Regions:
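Glycine-rich nucleotide/cofactor/substrate-binding loop typically near the N-terminus or early
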Residues: 37-107
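Internal gly/pro-rich beta-alpha loop/helix module
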Residues: 124-125, 143-207
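Short, ordered loop/turn segments at secondary-structure junctions
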Residues: 14-15, 36-40, 53-57, 106, ...
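Short coil/turn connectors at secondary-structure junctions
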Residues: 3-7, 27-30, 45-48, 70-74, ...
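A short, charged helix-loop
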Residues: 100-123, 127-169, 216-224
Protein backbone atom coordinates (compact mmCIF):
# COMPACT_ATOMS: atom_id res chain seq x y z
CA UNK A 1 0.00 0.00 0.00
CA UNK A 2 1.29 3.45 -0.89
CA UNK A 3 1.28 6.03 1.90
CA UNK A 4 1.78 9.75 1.48
CA UNK A 5 4.24 11.46 3.79
CA UNK A 6 2.42 14.29 5.54
CA UNK A 7 4.43 14.65 8.74
CA UNK A 8 8.03 13.93 9.66
CA UNK A 9 10.10 13.76 12.83
CA UNK A 10 13.74 14.68 12.28
CA UNK A 11 16.47 14.32 14.92
CA UNK A 12 20.01 13.77 13.68
CA UNK A 13 23.58 14.12 14.93
CA UNK A 14 25.06 14.56 11.46
CA UNK A 15 23.50 17.41 9.46
CA UNK A 16 25.29 16.85 6.12
CA UNK A 17 22.76 16.60 3.30
CA UNK A 18 19.81 17.38 5.55
CA UNK A 19 19.30 20.82 4.02
CA UNK A 20 18.18 19.59 0.61
CA UNK A 21 16.03 16.83 2.12
CA UNK A 22 14.33 19.28 4.48
CA UNK A 23 13.61 21.59 1.55
CA UNK A 24 12.19 18.70 -0.47
CA UNK A 25 9.88 17.76 2.39
CA UNK A 26 8.82 21.36 2.88
CA UNK A 27 8.06 21.76 -0.82
CA UNK A 28 5.83 18.68 -0.57
CA UNK A 29 3.87 20.32 2.24
CA UNK A 30 5.18 17.96 4.94
CA UNK A 31 4.82 19.16 8.54
CA UNK A 32 8.21 18.94 10.26
CA UNK A 33 8.89 18.24 13.93
CA UNK A 34 12.36 18.32 15.41
CA UNK A 35 14.60 18.63 18.46
CA UNK A 36 17.45 20.82 19.67
CA UNK A 37 20.25 21.38 17.20
CA UNK A 38 18.35 19.76 14.35
CA UNK A 39 15.42 22.11 14.86
CA UNK A 40 17.74 25.13 14.82
CA UNK A 41 19.42 23.82 11.65
CA UNK A 42 16.04 23.58 9.90
CA UNK A 43 14.91 26.97 11.21
CA UNK A 44 18.09 28.53 9.81
CA UNK A 45 16.93 27.29 6.38
CA UNK A 46 13.77 29.40 6.85
CA UNK A 47 11.68 26.23 6.94
CA UNK A 48 8.83 26.02 9.48
CA UNK A 49 9.44 23.36 12.11
CA UNK A 50 7.60 22.43 15.31
CA UNK A 51 9.70 21.81 18.41
CA UNK A 52 9.12 18.43 20.02
CA UNK A 53 9.05 20.25 23.35
CA UNK A 54 5.97 22.15 22.14
CA UNK A 55 4.28 18.86 21.29
CA UNK A 56 5.10 17.08 24.55
CA UNK A 57 4.98 20.15 26.84
CA UNK A 58 8.20 18.84 28.38
CA UNK A 59 11.65 20.35 27.86
CA UNK A 60 14.78 18.39 27.08
CA UNK A 61 16.10 17.27 30.48
CA UNK A 62 19.12 15.60 32.11
CA UNK A 63 21.59 17.40 29.88
CA UNK A 64 19.84 16.19 26.73
CA UNK A 65 19.61 12.56 27.83
CA UNK A 66 15.81 12.72 27.60
CA UNK A 67 14.32 14.55 24.63
CA UNK A 68 12.01 12.35 22.58
CA UNK A 69 11.11 9.61 25.08
CA UNK A 70 7.44 10.52 25.44
CA UNK A 71 4.08 8.89 24.57
CA UNK A 72 3.18 11.82 22.31
CA UNK A 73 6.21 11.00 20.18
CA UNK A 74 6.12 7.21 20.21
CA UNK A 75 2.35 7.05 20.02
CA UNK A 76 2.47 8.99 16.77
CA UNK A 77 5.10 6.64 15.37
CA UNK A 78 3.62 3.33 16.50
CA UNK A 79 -0.08 3.95 15.86
CA UNK A 80 -1.73 1.49 13.47
CA UNK A 81 -3.76 3.65 11.13
CA UNK A 82 -6.30 0.92 10.43
CA UNK A 83 -6.99 0.22 14.11
CA UNK A 84 -9.91 2.34 15.29
CA UNK A 85 -8.83 2.18 18.93
CA UNK A 86 -5.32 3.39 18.10
CA UNK A 87 -6.66 6.36 16.16
CA UNK A 88 -9.26 7.18 18.82
CA UNK A 89 -6.53 7.27 21.46
CA UNK A 90 -4.39 9.56 19.30
CA UNK A 91 -7.36 11.89 19.01
CA UNK A 92 -8.10 11.69 22.73
CA UNK A 93 -4.55 12.65 23.70
CA UNK A 94 -3.99 15.05 20.77
CA UNK A 95 -1.13 13.04 19.30
CA UNK A 96 -0.16 13.61 15.66
CA UNK A 97 0.86 10.71 13.45
CA UNK A 98 4.40 10.58 12.07
CA UNK A 99 4.67 9.19 8.54
CA UNK A 100 8.44 9.64 8.36
CA UNK A 101 11.19 9.43 10.97
CA UNK A 102 14.70 10.59 10.12
CA UNK A 103 17.18 9.83 12.88
CA UNK A 104 20.80 8.77 13.25
CA UNK A 105 22.81 7.70 16.28
CA UNK A 106 25.46 9.25 18.47
CA UNK A 107 28.97 8.32 17.24
CA UNK A 108 29.68 5.65 19.85
CA UNK A 109 32.21 3.62 17.89
CA UNK A 110 34.04 6.71 16.63
CA UNK A 111 34.41 7.90 20.22
CA UNK A 112 35.89 4.53 21.22
CA UNK A 113 38.30 4.41 18.26
CA UNK A 114 39.42 7.99 18.91
CA UNK A 115 40.37 7.13 22.49
CA UNK A 116 37.53 8.85 24.31
CA UNK A 117 37.31 8.65 28.08
CA UNK A 118 34.90 6.22 29.70
CA UNK A 119 32.48 9.03 30.55
CA UNK A 120 32.62 10.36 26.97
CA UNK A 121 31.97 6.87 25.60
CA UNK A 122 29.05 6.28 27.98
CA UNK A 123 27.46 9.57 26.92
CA UNK A 124 27.63 8.44 23.29
CA UNK A 125 25.35 5.46 23.99
CA UNK A 126 22.22 6.59 22.20
CA UNK A 127 18.91 5.89 23.92
CA UNK A 128 16.28 8.05 22.25
CA UNK A 129 17.62 7.61 18.73
CA UNK A 130 17.79 3.82 18.89
CA UNK A 131 14.26 3.74 20.32
CA UNK A 132 12.94 5.93 17.50
CA UNK A 133 14.62 3.74 14.90
CA UNK A 134 13.16 0.54 16.30
CA UNK A 135 9.69 2.00 16.76
CA UNK A 136 9.48 3.36 13.23
CA UNK A 137 10.96 0.21 11.71
CA UNK A 138 8.50 -1.96 13.62
CA UNK A 139 5.62 0.08 12.22
CA UNK A 140 6.95 0.13 8.64
CA UNK A 141 3.46 -0.66 7.39
CA UNK A 142 2.64 2.99 8.08
CA UNK A 143 5.91 4.76 8.86
CA UNK A 144 9.10 5.29 6.86
CA UNK A 145 12.38 5.19 8.79
CA UNK A 146 15.60 6.76 7.49
CA UNK A 147 18.49 5.75 9.74
CA UNK A 148 21.46 6.61 7.50
CA UNK A 149 22.29 9.91 5.81
CA UNK A 150 23.44 7.96 2.75
CA UNK A 151 19.74 7.32 2.06
CA UNK A 152 18.76 11.00 1.90
CA UNK A 153 19.19 11.23 -1.87
CA UNK A 154 17.28 8.00 -2.39
CA UNK A 155 14.39 9.27 -0.30
CA UNK A 156 14.39 12.61 -2.13
CA UNK A 157 14.20 10.81 -5.45
CA UNK A 158 11.29 8.65 -4.32
CA UNK A 159 9.41 11.62 -2.91
CA UNK A 160 9.85 13.67 -6.07
CA UNK A 161 9.03 10.84 -8.48
CA UNK A 162 6.09 9.42 -6.51
CA UNK A 163 4.36 12.63 -5.42
CA UNK A 164 5.41 12.23 -1.80
CA UNK A 165 4.28 8.61 -1.52
CA UNK A 166 6.24 5.46 -0.69
CA UNK A 167 5.23 1.86 -1.28
CA UNK A 168 5.14 -0.69 1.50
CA UNK A 169 8.08 -2.54 -0.07
CA UNK A 170 10.12 0.66 -0.06
CA UNK A 171 9.25 1.25 3.58
CA UNK A 172 10.17 -2.33 4.45
CA UNK A 173 13.54 -1.93 2.71
CA UNK A 174 14.31 1.13 4.82
CA UNK A 175 13.10 -0.74 7.94
CA UNK A 176 15.42 -3.67 7.18
CA UNK A 177 18.38 -1.32 7.00
CA UNK A 178 17.26 0.37 10.22
CA UNK A 179 17.28 -2.90 12.15
CA UNK A 180 20.75 -3.65 10.76
CA UNK A 181 21.92 -0.22 11.93
CA UNK A 182 20.34 -0.83 15.33
CA UNK A 183 21.81 -4.30 15.82
CA UNK A 184 25.28 -3.23 14.65
CA UNK A 185 25.24 -0.30 17.05
CA UNK A 186 24.26 -2.50 19.99
CA UNK A 187 26.94 -5.02 18.99
CA UNK A 188 29.60 -2.30 19.16
CA UNK A 189 28.38 -1.27 22.61
CA UNK A 190 28.33 -4.86 23.87
CA UNK A 191 31.84 -5.43 22.52
CA UNK A 192 33.11 -2.37 24.35
CA UNK A 193 31.55 -3.48 27.63
CA UNK A 194 33.06 -6.92 27.03
CA UNK A 195 36.52 -5.40 26.70
CA UNK A 196 36.84 -5.97 22.98
CA UNK A 197 38.69 -3.34 20.97
CA UNK A 198 38.20 -2.26 17.37
CA UNK A 199 41.51 -1.29 15.75
CA UNK A 200 41.92 -0.02 12.21
CA UNK A 201 44.30 -2.10 10.07
CA UNK A 202 46.44 -0.93 7.17
CA UNK A 203 44.34 -2.85 4.65
CA UNK A 204 42.08 -5.88 4.32
CA UNK A 205 42.57 -9.10 2.40
CA UNK A 206 43.48 -6.86 -0.52
CA UNK A 207 45.28 -3.48 -0.33
CA UNK A 208 42.21 -1.53 -1.50
CA UNK A 209 39.95 -2.95 1.23
CA UNK A 210 39.33 -1.45 4.65
CA UNK A 211 39.67 -3.77 7.64
CA UNK A 212 39.50 -3.70 11.42
CA UNK A 213 40.59 -5.99 14.23
CA UNK A 214 37.90 -6.48 16.84
CA UNK A 215 38.62 -8.46 19.98
CA UNK A 216 40.66 -8.57 23.14
CA UNK A 217 44.35 -8.26 22.32
CA UNK A 218 45.29 -9.84 25.64
CA UNK A 219 43.65 -13.08 24.48
CA UNK A 220 45.55 -13.13 21.18
CA UNK A 221 49.17 -12.55 22.17
CA UNK A 222 51.45 -13.70 24.94
CA UNK A 223 52.85 -10.95 27.08
CA UNK A 224 56.65 -10.59 26.97
CA UNK A 225 58.30 -9.29 30.10
CA UNK A 226 61.77 -7.78 30.16
CA UNK A 227 63.75 -7.73 33.35
Amino acid sequence: MNRKIQSALISVFYKEGLDTLAKTLHNQGVTLYSTGGTRKFIEDLNIPVIAIEDLTSYPSILGGRVKTLHPKVFGGILARREENQDMEELSQFEIPTFDLVIVDLYPFNETVVNGGSESDIIEKIDIGGISLIRAAAKNFKYTTIISDKSDYLKLEGLINSQNGELTINQRKTFATKAFNVSSGYDRDIADWFDGKTKIGLRYGENPHQEAHFKGNLNECFEKIFFC
